[in-house]
From Swiss-Prot:
Start and end residues of each Rhodanese domain: 140-234
Active site, UniProt feature: C194 (cysteine persulfide intermediate)
Gene: trhO
Alphabetized UniProt keyword annotations: Oxidoreductase, tRNA processing
BP GO terms, sorted: tRNA modification
Record keyword tRNA processing present: yes
EC numbers: 1.14.-.-
Protein name stated in the entry: tRNA uridine(34) hydroxylase
Organism: Acinetobacter baylyi (strain ATCC 33305 / BD413 / ADP1)
Role according to the record: Catalyzes oxygen-dependent 5-hydroxyuridine (ho5U) modification at position 34 in tRNAs.
Example of a GO MF term: oxidoreductase activity, acting on paired donors, with incorporation or reduction of molecular oxygen
One Pfam family cited in the UniProt record for this chain: UPF0176_N
InterPro entries registered for this protein in UniProt: Rhodanese-like_dom (IPR001763), Rhodanese-like_dom_sf (IPR036873), TrhO (IPR020936), TRHO_N (IPR040503)
Length: 314
């Protein structure tokens, strides 16, 4: 039986800290046995009440995962706390944002730190890790099947040249995709990638568990690739969707040009924003025909409330 216990703490940092203009964004995860996940959740809650931090951390018996943002002191504090808790092998990446990327700080207690819905053992069985140079060499080969393990809206913002889109809406759908589309390719080289690497820890573990022979994944995910790979050597096309206020990033992990439709969540290019179907917070080319006028009116009301709240803070 799946459970999900969420705890949310509002920002309690001093006003002068809230004026941060250089938000350090830290994406992190590690698969590690956690003896008492509920206790770790509570101690994290106690800590984040004392520092200027926003974002989400997911805690489970299998480890920790999340993205948080704050000033330098806050990020260093949370990282030191996790290191002291034994998370010495975290996959950890930093980038920057000029604006606050998340509204709140959430610490969630869940059954999985990334939900696949199928039991796998990524601490014991995972695919071969490849650095960016090795990755470029592998996916340039004709005998490799390249699979994007992310969701459809993420694929839309950008992907690697030649990558297959599984057309999943959630990661839970990925095991079914494997059964229906990859089972006949167990003797092939399979290369997989995701945003920060965590979904590939589970997807490669799944394939190996199912009897696939050669399974590879990009160490550190797309974010690490964009951070380390010069644009002129890159096989990445488009931008990388991220789950914060930046919407998407590009090479150097710099903020991209895509913006998010706040009605449906899909990333939009500047050209799509210029279409008549786009109304900020209300509709875009991908959802305008999928919502009723009553729903659109509700979205407009929500946007008015958001705008009023922003004016009040100024």
């Amino acid at each position: 039986m799946e459970f999900s216990m969420n705890a949310t703490v509002e920002q309690l940092a001093p006003v002068e800290q809230q004026a941060t203009t250089d938000w350090v964004v830290a994406a992190l995860y590690q698969f590690k046995e956690v003896a008492d996940a509920a206790d770790l959740q509570q101690r994290l809650l106690d800590l984040v009440k004392t520092i200027n931090l926003c974002g989400t951390l997911i805690v489970a018996s299998e480890g920790i995962n999340g993205t948080v943002a704050g000033d330098r002191h806050a990020i260093d504090t949370i990282r030191e706390f996790l290191l002291n808790e034994g998370f010495h092998a975290m996959e950890y990446k930093e980038s920057h944002s000029a604006e606050k990327p998340f509204r709140k700080m959430k610490i969630k207690l869940k059954q999985e730190i990334v939900t696949l819905g199928v039991e796998v053992k990524p601490r014991d069985l995972v695919g071969h890790y490849l650095d960016p140079k090795e990755w470029n060499e592998l996916i340039s080969r004709d005998d490799v099947i390249l699979v994007d393990t992310r969701n459809d809206y993420e694929y839309k913002a950008g992907t690697f040249k030649g990558a297959i889109d599984p057309k999943t809406e959630t990661f839970r759908e990925f095991p079914d995709y494997v059964k229906q589309n990859l089972e006949q390719h167990k003797d092939k080289k399979i290369a997989m990638f995701c945003t920060g690497g965590i979904r590939c820890e589970k997807s490669t573990s799944l394939l190996l568990q199912e009897g696939f022979n050669e399974v590879y994944h990009l160490k550190g995910g797309i974010l690490k690739y964009l951070e380390e790979t010069p644009a002129e050597e890159s096989l990445w096309e488009g931008e990388c969707f991220v789950f914060d206020g930046r919407t998407a990033v590009t090479h150097g992990v710099e903020e991209g040009q895509n913006v998010k439709c706040h009605a449906c969540g899909w990333p939009l290019t500047p050209e799509e924003v210029a279409l008549p179907s786009y109304e900020h917070g209300v509709s875009c080319v991908y959802c305008i025909e999928k919502t009723t006028e009553k729903q659109k009116e509700g979205f407009r009301m929500r946007q008015s409330q958001i705008a009023a709240a922003k004016r009040k803070r100024l």
